[in-house]
Amino acid sequence: MSNDKRTIYVGGLADEVTERLLNNAFIPFGDIADIQMPADYESQRHRGFAFIEYEQSEDAAAAIDNMNDSELCGRTIRVNLAKPVRVKEDSFKPIWADDDWLQKHAGATLQPEGEPEAEKVETPSTGPAVIEKAEKRNPQVFFDIRIGGNDAGRIVMLLRADVVPKTAENFRQLCTHEQGYGYKGCSFHRVIPEFMCQGGDFTNNNGTGGKSIYGKKFNDENFNLKHNSFGTLSMANSGANTNGSQFFICTTKTDWLDNKHVVFGHVISGAEVVRKMERCGSKSGTPSQKIVIYSCGELK
């Protein structure tokens, strides 16, 4: 794995996190060259951290900006720039096998042996804070989904308030019901396999209704974010500047929608739930089973 500014360290991972889940959570920021999850050879489980190498250093920086201190599988993760030590040219030992390296660069993954508790209090638990920002981090919201009356799981989404603040705030408040209305009880009325799952019409549940927190409709904010991967979260519309409450989750790359629909976030957890929803779809868009958001809100 490369040791330049294209490689990031992801720590604090829950046991159930897999390489595929990491790929789904981090690929919205750019093309990924490699993912490595060092294993504990006794337990055969990963050691609670991973290294992700991007094709471009700018994409790695974007991943750090958006994913550090975010939630993945119920745990807050740390995302920093990986800072490997120099190794001999003839050494095939991976950098993460060196405990000295882990103590310096892997946050609170390891503690030095015999360290007194008083000293531990003084040691930062979050490791090397490569980027410290005072501004508010991008919000995370969730949908708890039922399919055919049965619980299907939770989808967690990161909203890009740093790029499209107005659109992200609309979606956030519709998840929290701060205005007295929103997505709770709303259905996904249109699902097309290998394309997208559309919902958000909480007034008619058929694609003809819904409203934003700003009124019935509001203008397109910008088209800076693209429909570049599975899990992209974008606004549905009936033409330019007709955004309301309806949205869709892409199940594949849909770049023909770029500059026509406003992308405002992406799925960071619950990809398997989106796939369950997708399997209920049809070419016409009519789901074979009712897909309902039975609970929703913001993760703090």
Swiss-Prot record:
Annotated SMART domains: RRM (SM00360), RRM_1 (SM00361)
Enzymatic reactions: [protein]-peptidylproline (omega=180) = [protein]-peptidylproline (omega=0)
Does the UniProt entry include the keyword Isomerase? Answer: yes
**What is the annotated localization of this protein?**
Nucleus
Record-annotated RRM domain positions: 6-84
Keyword Zinc, does the record have it?
Answer: no
CDD domains recorded = cyclophilin_ABH_like, RRM_PPIE
Matching entries from SUPFAM superfamilies are given as:
Cyclophilin-like (SSF50891), RNA-binding domain, RBD (SSF54928)
Q: Where is the PPIase cyclophilin-type domain?
A: 142-298
The highest taxon in the source lineage is Eukaryota
Q: Name one Pfam family in it.
A: Pro_isomerase
Q: Which UniProt keywords apply?
A: Isomerase, Nucleus, RNA-binding, Rotamase
Q: Which InterPro entries match?
A: Cyclophilin-like_dom_sf (IPR029000), Cyclophilin-type_PPIase_CS (IPR020892), Cyclophilin-type_PPIase_dom (IPR002130), Nucleotide-bd_a/b_plait_sf (IPR012677), PPIE (IPR016304), PPIE_RRM (IPR034168), RBD_domain_sf (IPR035979), RRM_dom (IPR000504)
Q: Which PROSITE patterns match?
A: CSA_PPIASE_1, CSA_PPIASE_2, RRM
What Gene Ontology cellular component terms go with this record? catalytic step 2 spliceosome; cytoplasm; intracellular membrane-bounded organelle; precatalytic spliceosome; Prp19 complex
Q: What is one GO biological process annotated to this record?
A: mRNA splicing, via spliceosome
- GO molecular function ontology, one term from the record: cyclosporin A binding
> Which EC number applies?
5.2.1.8
PANTHER family in the record, alphabetically?
A: PEPTIDYL-PROLYL CIS-TRANS ISOMERASE, PEPTIDYL-PROLYL CIS-TRANS ISOMERASE D-RELATED
Q: What role does this protein play?
A: PPIases accelerate the folding of proteins. It catalyzes the cis-trans isomerization of proline imidic peptide bonds in oligopeptides. Combines RNA-binding and PPIase activities.
Q: Name the family.
A: Belongs to the cyclophilin-type PPIase family. PPIase E subfamily.
Name listed for the protein in its UniProt record:
Peptidyl-prolyl cis-trans isomerase E
Q: Which organism is it from?
A: Drosophila melanogaster (Fruit fly)
User: What gene name does this entry carry?
Assistant: cyp33
